């Protein structure tokens, strides 16, 4: 597998060059064999999709609680339409008491808005506004369950973060922080702090979103050659500012400077590690103003000591504040700042205005463009489509994990097979949830009915929909949903259709989403927990062999399905598991002689 697979949340193993094989020579599989196992218990929490509006009934103003310092311009906007309570530095207990009297809450990163906050509001809290981008401190599942819309302010601090990244890069290259400390200590060591020039150097921007784009613009102005890696960045946007989009491996191998601007997700956690540092040009310099967790900090210390990384400039850390005795922070070739990316007066005012406008709009029942959890659809439609909504998201999530890291998804086709006429089947929510499933595993964007099409367009993802009208009763809204991703490289060759597209199909059985087809192979496995897909030679004992390996590792199997072309030919085994197998366990499965390839998928 290529190194770009490090950016993927799944683990894939394939033998030889199976990854590029299509299944065009195989005939469609007519049947599937299924074996069911008892589950240890699954999370059955039902989520409501909401779009809020706030009305006090008696014409009085709503109450907005501002729990952390907000710019004056934002406070004034709030005071024009609401009663504003600015209470800073509250304890969790104080917040829980006060929240029952409030319709909206505005926080920054220092206030944890957990389930207990929503429970304490007794249903009155309608909007939570996060003054900034990250929403790690807000329990989105609880917010949605309690009918509370969460909005953020993702654009106002873009320039500030980009400027700080450039400032750190220049300060690092010229040893500004170290030289400053030396002079203040009474020294005058000019030769010790000779730096390097930026002009003519290659900067790799990892994550070409809003901040990454602005960093690239400024680096170009400094005379740097800029390349970028982001599987979902539109090539035309990059080319418009003179930036070449390259693979993850190429970015690592050719860069003199690397600037990180990716979100922290399960797929990007510790994406810079011992393995990826080893692929970098010796003497590379690294800047991080994104999220601390995208770098394995211990591995970075080792890379610095080994001379692979010449210098690093960091504004963010895995744990903030970092430990006083942190080897990374104390390293003589590391420049650090205390998470100042958005800390300019202009950015603070901009964030205040942006979040105030979003909260006021949401309280007025408007569709919030910066909403990060789902809006409401009619109760009737939601009740009927609820299991299909879950199916849609999981099919999208499964399909994107079958794509080899770095190839990027640009085209997705959704096929709905139904006995209902087009006018009787509203697929907007299903389309949004498939978009959510495709984008969220590799992004920090929270996709919902409000922002799905906008987010897809922004990331260069084109979605087309097709209806297949079936004969029969239209009592059930859908028979199957099929998701196909074209022009991509697959990490699991068997997921390719006869036309070379990653293809997955599913349906709802007794209210539970099922995976029913992978590529041209028919299977039948519930879309819960995690799934292992194996392509194997169909022979006796395979179910027992794989099951024994999982059992020895205390991995509980809840469902197993085998689909085959014909007896003793190729087959696909789909195994549903309640637990995440270790790498060693997965390796043992891959070493079974009859297993030709396999992939582990987290749903």
Swiss-Prot record:
The keyword Transit peptide applies. NAD(+) binds at residues 210-211, 230, 289-291, 315, 339-342. Keywords: Chloroplast, NAD, Oxidoreductase, Plastid, Transit peptide. Residues 1-54 form a transit peptide. Ubiquitous, but highly expressed in roots. Expressed in vasculature, root and shoot meristems, distal part of cotyledons and leaves, anther, stigma and pollen grains. Detected at the tip of the cotyledons in late embryos. It catalyses: (2R)-3-phosphoglycerate + NAD(+) = 3-phosphooxypyruvate + NADH + H(+). Induction: Up-regulated in the aerial parts by dark treatment, high CO(2) levels and necrotrophic pathogen infection. Pfam families: 2-Hacid_dh (PF00389), 2-Hacid_dh_C (PF02826), ACT (PF01842), PGDH_inter (PF19304). It comes from the Eukaryota. Residues 531-603 form the ACT domain. GO terms for biological process: embryo development ending in seed dormancy; L-serine biosynthetic process; megagametogenesis; pollen development; sulfur amino acid metabolic process. Its EC number is 1.1.1.95. Partially inhibited by 5 mM serine. Pathway: Amino-acid biosynthesis; L-serine biosynthesis; L-serine from 3-phospho-D-glycerate: step 1/3. InterPro entries: ACT-like_dom_sf, ACT_dom, Ado_hCys_hydrolase_NAD-bd, ASB_dom_sf, D-isomer_2_OHA_DH_cat_dom, D-isomer_DH_CS, D-isomer_DH_CS1, D-isomer_DH_NAD-bd. Involved in the plastidial phosphorylated pathway of serine biosynthesis (PPSB). Required for mature pollen development. Belongs to the D-isomer specific 2-hydroxyacid dehydrogenase family. This is D-3-phosphoglycerate dehydrogenase 1, chloroplastic. The gene is PGDH1.
């Amino acid at each position: 597998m290529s190194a770009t697979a490090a950016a993927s949340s799944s683990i894939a193993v394939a033998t030889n060059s199976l990854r590029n094989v299509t299944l065009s020579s195989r005939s469609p599989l007519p049947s599937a064999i299924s074996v069911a196992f008892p589950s240890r218990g699954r999370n059955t929490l039902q989520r409501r999709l909401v779009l809020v509006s706030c009305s006090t009934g008696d014409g009085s103003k709503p109450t907005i609680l501002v729990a952390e310092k907000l710019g004056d311009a934002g406070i004034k906007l709030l005071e024009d339409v609401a009663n504003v309570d600015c209470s800073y530095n509250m304890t969790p207990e104080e917040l829980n008491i006060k929240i029952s009297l409030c319709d909206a809450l505005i926080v920054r990163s220092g206030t944890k808005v957990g389930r207990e906050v929503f429970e304490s509001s007794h249903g009155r809290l309608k909007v939570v506004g996060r003054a900034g981008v990250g929403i790690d401190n807000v329990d989105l599942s609880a917010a949605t369950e309690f009918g509370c819309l969460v909005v953020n302010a993702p654009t106002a601090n873009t320039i500030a973060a980009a400027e700080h990244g450039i400032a750190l890069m220049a300060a690092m290259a010229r040893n500004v922080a170290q030289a400053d400390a030396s002079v203040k200590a009474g020294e005058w060591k000019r030769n010790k702090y000779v730096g390097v020039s930026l002009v003519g150097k290659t900067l790799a921007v990892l994550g070409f979103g809003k901040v990454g784009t602005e960093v690239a613009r400024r680096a170009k102005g400094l005379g740097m050659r800029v390349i970028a890696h982001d599987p979902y960045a539109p090539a035309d946007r990059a080319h418009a500012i003179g930036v070449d989009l390259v693979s993850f491996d190429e970015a690592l191998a050719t860069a003199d400077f690397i600037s990180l601007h990716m979100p922290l997700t399960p797929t990007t956690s510790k994406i810079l590690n011992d393995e990826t540092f080893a692929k970098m040009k010796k003497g590379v310099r690294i800047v991080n103003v994104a999220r601390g967790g995208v770098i394995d900090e211990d591995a970075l210390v080792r890379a610095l000591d080994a001379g692979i990384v010449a210098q690093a400039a960091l504004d963010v850390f895995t744990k903030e504040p970092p430990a006083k005795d942190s080897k990374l922070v104390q390293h003589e070739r590391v420049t650090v700042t205390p998470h100042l990316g958005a800390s300019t007066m202009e950015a603070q005012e901009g964030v205040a205005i942006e979040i105030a406008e979003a909260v006021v709009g949401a309280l007025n029942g408007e569709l919030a463009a910066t909403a990060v959890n789902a809006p409401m659809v009619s109760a009737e439609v939601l009740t009927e489509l609820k299991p299909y909504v879950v199916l849609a998201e999981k099919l999208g999530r499964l399909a994107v994990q079958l794509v080899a890291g770095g190839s990027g998804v640009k085209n997705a086709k959704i096929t709905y097979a139904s006995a209902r006429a087009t006018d009787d089947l509203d697929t907007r929510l299903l389309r949004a949830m498939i978009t959510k499933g495709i984008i969220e595993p590799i992004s920090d964007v929270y996709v919902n009915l409000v922002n799905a099409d906008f987010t897809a367009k922004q990331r260069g993802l084109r979605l087309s929909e097709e209806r297949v009208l079936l004969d029969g009763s239209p009592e059930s809204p859908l028979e199957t949903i099929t998701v196909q991703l074209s022009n991509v490289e697959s990490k699991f060759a068997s997921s390719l259709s006869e036309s070379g597209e990653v293809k997955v199909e599913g349906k709802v059985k007794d209210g539970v989403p099922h995976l029913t087809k992978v590529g041209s192979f028919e299977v039948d496995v519930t879309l819960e927990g995690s799934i292992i897909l194996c392509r194997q030679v169909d022979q006796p004992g395979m179910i027992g062999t794989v099951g024994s390996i999982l059992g020895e590792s205390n991995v509980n199997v809840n469902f197993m399905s085998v689909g085959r072309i014909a007896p003793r030919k190729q087959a696909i085994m789909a195994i549903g598991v309640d637990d995440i197998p270790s790498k060693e366990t997965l390796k043992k499965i891959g070493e079974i002689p009859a297993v030709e390839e396999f992939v582990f998928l987290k749903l």
